[in-house]
Amino acid sequence: RMVLLKGHDERGFVFYTNFESRKAGDVLGNPNVALLFHWKSLRRQVRIEGPASRVTNAEGDAYFASRMRESQLGAWASDQSRPLDSRETFETRYQAMVERFEGKDVPRPPHWSGFRVVPERIEFWQDRAHRLHERRLFTRSGEGWSEGLLYP
C-alpha cells in the first residue's frame, strides 16, 4: 500500500488513514508491516520492518486538527474504498458535512486515526554495477541496534 509518512521520532514512523479502509483492515489483521522508501534516481532504498499499532487518541486528534478543513470534511464524507454510484452522491455527502460543521471545529471521525510502525529491522540498499548491490541491515537488539551486511 502507498501511504504518506506524516511523522517519525524515537518511537517509530507514523501514517494516518481511514480505519474502515482495506488498507487499515490489512494492517489490523496482520500488524507486521514493512515501509519502503525507494529513490530510483538516487539508486537507493530503505526498508523498515516492524509491528504497527494505533496511535493514541490525542495524537490522532492533534494531527486531524492540523489538516485543512476541506480534508477534514472529506474524511467525514467518504466511505473510503467502498463502491460509489456517482460522483454527485459523494459531492452531496461532502456538502452535507460542510453544513453540519458550519461555524464549528471539525472533530476527528471515530473511524479515522493513525498507525505507528515500531522499527525492528532497517535495511539500507544501494544499487551497484552488475547487481553487486550493497545491503546494510540494522536489527533492534534490546535497547540498541546491531549492524551487519547482507549478500545482494
Which role does the model predict for each range below?
Residues 1-152:
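Binding-site signature for planar aromatic cofactors or substrates
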